[in-house]
Amino acid sequence: MRTLVGVLAGLACLTAFAGPAPAGEPATMSQTIVNVEYEGSKIWVPGTIVVKKGTKVTLKLINNVPSDPNQHGFAIPGYNVAAIVNRGEPQTVEFTADKAGIFPIICQLHPAHVGGELVVLE
């Protein structure tokens, strides 16, 4: 029990005195987004991406719909991000989330399809 208390006290001290990330180095986030078929609809999973303002975002896009040879689009118009993803040919998009808000993720090839949302927190 004393060992556990000592370890917890040590962790508390480390946490209390740990400083923030060095100034000038933006946070980064990398995530894989996969296009799948679910109940007859093609969707990007995960459908919601949440980051803090100022984060450098890298998204690897994979079209994983085996029954559909078509291309699928991935676009975040609020950030001028767009890619066309063929099955078996992953694409990568990068941008800095420099505006707070909620931004729709759409398929620019099929405008009626909304694929999710990018949530950028202050």
Language-model segments: what does each one mean?
Residues 6-16:
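Bacterial N-terminal signal peptides
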Residues 17-23:
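Sec/Tat signal peptide C-region and signal peptidase I cleavage site
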Residues 24-28, 85-122:
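Extracellular/periplasmic metallocenter environments
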Residues 25-56:
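N-terminal edge beta-strand
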Residues 35, 55, 61-65, 76-80, ...:
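A mature extracytoplasmic/lumenal domain signature
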Residues 46-49, 80-84, 93-94:
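Beta-strand-rich interaction surfaces with strong enrichment in secreted/lumenal proteins
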Residues 47, 55, 70, 89, ...:
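Residues that flank catalytic or metal-binding motifs in active/ligand-binding sites
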Residues 64-89, 117:
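Histidine- and aromatic-enriched segments that form or immediately flank copper-ligand environments
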